[in-house]
């Protein structure tokens, strides 16, 4: 799987789906990604956009790539 920002889906609902697919808690996911719980909450609420790099990392994790 190669990164392609053209596949970026900025919807918080998509992020929530990816997070749910990992089976990880938000704190565990934050530690894995090197971000705070607050960042994840802000992304999920739509307050702040999440970066494509986060989407790609989660997609790789879900697909076990």
How would you label these PLM feature ranges?
Residues 23-41:
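Short alpha-helical DNA-recognition segment
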Residues 38-45, 53:
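Amphipathic, hydrophobic secondary-structure cores in small proteins
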Residues 16, 30, 41-42, 59:
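Key DNA-contacting residues within the recognition helix of helix-turn-helix
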Residues 52-65:
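DNA major-groove recognition helix of helix-turn-helix/homeodomain DNA-binding modules
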Residues 1-2, 42, 48, 65:
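Short, charged recognition helix plus adjacent turn
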Residues 4-6, 23-26, 56-57:
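Recognition helices and adjacent regulatory flanks at domain boundaries
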Residues 20, 34, 45-47:
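Residue-level detection of the helix-turn-helix DNA-binding "recognition helix"
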Residues 1-21:
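A short, Lys/Arg-rich alpha-helix, primarily the initiator
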